[in-house]
C-alpha cells in the first residue's frame, strides 16, 4: 500500500490487482509496473487516476514523436510497439468529476455530456474513452463518493458563490474555457480572494465536489454546461 505494507483487504489499506482492473485498464497497470517491473510496488487506490492520466498523456504524445523518441515512450513497450491511435478527449480526473456532478449511473449519461462538448465523436471510434467511462463510474462509487466531505459555506462564502452565479448567468454557452476561467478568477478577486485565489478555488471545489481539489473550472463549466453548473451551485448553497 502507500506505506509499503503488505495489502490487507480487511484493514482496507490498499487495493488488489483485481480491484485495479475494475478501476482502470490492464495497460495502465502495465505502465505503473513499467519503470521497475520486478520491484514490489505500492498499490493503493489514489495512484490509479494519476497513472491513467499519465497513460493517456503518453498515448497523446506518441503520434507526434520522432521515431527515436517513440521507442522511449512507455506505451510503445506497453502495447508491444503498436500503441492505439486515438485522440485523447479528456483526462480521467475530469471524467471522475463529471460522474459526481452528473450523478451518472451508467456510461450513456456520461456520453451525453461528452457529446455536448465534443459533438462529432462516437463511442465506437473512441474505445479507450468509452471504457474509461465505465472505469470512472466504478472508481467514483467505490473510492470517491464514500469519502466526500461537502463544505457548508458561511454567509460571506455564500455571497461570493452567488456572485459567481450572477457572472455565469451573463456568459454564453459557447464562450471558450479560458474566457470562463478568467471570469471565475475575476469573481474571486472581487470577493475577497485577490491575495489568495487558491482559497477561492478550494471553496468552489469543497462546496461543489466535496473535495479540496478539482478540475480546471473554465473547462468544467464549458463541458458540463453553464446552466447545469449554475443549478449545481444553487443546490449546494441553499
Where are these regions (language model features)?
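Basic, alpha-helical terminal appendages of large translation-related enzymes
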Residues: 104, 111-238
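Catalytic adenosine-cofactor/nucleotide-binding cores of aminoacyl-tRNA synthetases and other
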Residues: 1-134, 209-238
Amino acid at each position: 500500500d502507500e506505506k509499503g505494507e503488505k495489502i490487507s483487504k480487511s484493514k482496507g489499506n490498499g487495493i488488489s490487482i483485481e480491484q485495479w482492473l475494475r478501476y482502470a485498464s490492464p495497460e495502465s497497470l502495465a505502465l505503473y509496473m513499467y519503470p521497475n517491473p520486478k520491484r514490489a510496488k505500492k498499490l493503493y487506490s489514489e495512484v490509479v487516476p494519476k497513472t491513467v492520466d499519465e497513460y493517456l498523456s503518453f498515448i497523446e504524445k506518441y503520434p507526434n514523436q520522432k521515431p527515436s523518441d517513440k521507442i522511449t515512450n512507455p506505451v510503445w513497450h506497453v502495447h508491444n510497439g503498436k500503441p492505439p491511435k486515438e485522440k485523447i478527449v479528456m483526462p480521467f480526473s475530469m471524467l471522475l468529476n463529471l460522474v459526481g456532478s452528473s450523478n451518472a449511473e451508467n456510461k450513456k449519461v456520461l456520453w451525453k455530456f461528452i457529446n455536448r462538448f465534443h459533438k462529432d465523436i462516437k463511442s465506437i471510434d473512441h474505445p479507450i474513452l468509452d471504457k474509461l467511462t465505465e472505469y470512472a463510474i466504478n472508481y467514483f462509487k467505490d473510492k470517491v463518493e464514500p469519502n466526500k466531505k461537502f463544505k457548508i459555506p458561511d454567509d460571506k462564502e455564500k455571497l461570493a458563490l452567488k456572485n459567481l452565479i450572477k457572472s455565469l448567468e451573463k456568459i454564453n454557452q459557447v464562450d471558450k474555457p479560458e474566457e470562463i476561467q478568467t471570469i471565475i478568477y475575476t469573481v474571486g478577486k472581487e470577493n475577497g480572494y485577490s491575495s489568495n485565489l487558491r482559497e477561492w478555488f478550494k471553496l468552489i471545489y469543497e462546496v461543489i465536489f466535496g473535495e479540496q481539489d478539482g478540475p480546471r473550472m473554465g473547462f468544467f463549466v464549458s463541458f458540463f454546461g453553464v446552466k447545469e453548473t449554475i443549478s449545481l451551485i444553487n443546490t449546494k448553497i441553499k
